[in-house]
Amino acid sequence: MKSRNGPLRVGIGGPVGSGKTALTEKLCKAMRDDYSVAVVTNDIYTTEDAEALVRMQALPSDRIVGVETGGCPHTAIREDATINLQAIAGLNERFPDLDVVFIESGGDNLAATFSPDLADITIYVISVCQGEEIPRKGGPGITRSDLLVINKKDLAPHVGADLEVMDRDATRMRASRPFVFSDMKRGDGINSIVSFLREQGGL
């Protein structure tokens, strides 16, 4: 499956608590039987997300690399992606048949974006718990990501979020770009996301 250009690199961004690690876990488990998969996680001062993915048994531990970005996590995925590119290069050496690498950013704000040198496809994750107004607030993650994931839809009634309003706002803000509602705790929506990656990533 591996292309001449190396593995498909999928950037997963979004605010703290939106469900990035849960999405990464579910994607690994959904795709690992068909593809050679690895993960690079970004945390400011720890490798907590990488350790969590190992505990969740998303992949064998040698396929998960945690990098400590220090300071602002968006710098490591945008202005200077060297630390992430080095981690991917190391995984490529270890697994020459690598098909897909998921790059999970540290929790950041709505302005965070991935450098095109780092990610071929970008997924941006938000949570209904952050408020139904999040899609209309815009920002590059909302408007320009290849796929917007609106997670924790099951909690909408408990936090006063109207999914119809979020659907309407996401449609308006993203024009023709796709988005999906999900409940990563139960894996609801994961099949649509995997199908998107297969189609858009040429897997």
Curated annotation (Swiss-Prot):
UniProt xrefs under InterPro entries: CobW/HypB/UreG_nucleotide-bd, P-loop_NTPase, UreG
GO MF annotations, alphabetized: GTP binding; GTPase activity; nickel cation binding
One Pfam family this sequence matches: cobW
Highest taxon, organism lineage: Bacteria
Signal peptide positions on this chain: none
Subcellular location: Cytoplasm
Keyword Signal on entry: no
UniProt: GTP binding residues: G14, P15, V16, G17, S18, G19, K20, T21
Key words, A-Z: Chaperone, Cytoplasm, GTP-binding, Nickel insertion, Nucleotide-binding
Gene Ontology biological-process annotations: urea catabolic process
SUPFAM superfamilies, alphabetized: P-loop containing nucleoside triphosphate hydrolases (SSF52540)
GO cellular component, one term: cytoplasm
PANTHER family tied to this protein: UREASE ACCESSORY PROTEIN G (PTHR31715:SF0)
Function: Facilitates the functional incorporation of the urease nickel metallocenter. This process requires GTP hydrolysis, probably effectuated by UreG.
Family designation: Belongs to the SIMIBI class G3E GTPase family. UreG subfamily.
Subunit structure: Homodimer. UreD, UreF and UreG form a complex that acts as a GTP-hydrolysis-dependent molecular chaperone, activating the urease apoprotein by helping to assemble the nickel containing metallocenter of UreC. The UreE protein probably delivers the nickel.
The protein's name: Urease accessory protein UreG
Organism of derivation: Rhizobium etli (strain CIAT 652)
Gene responsible for this protein: ureG
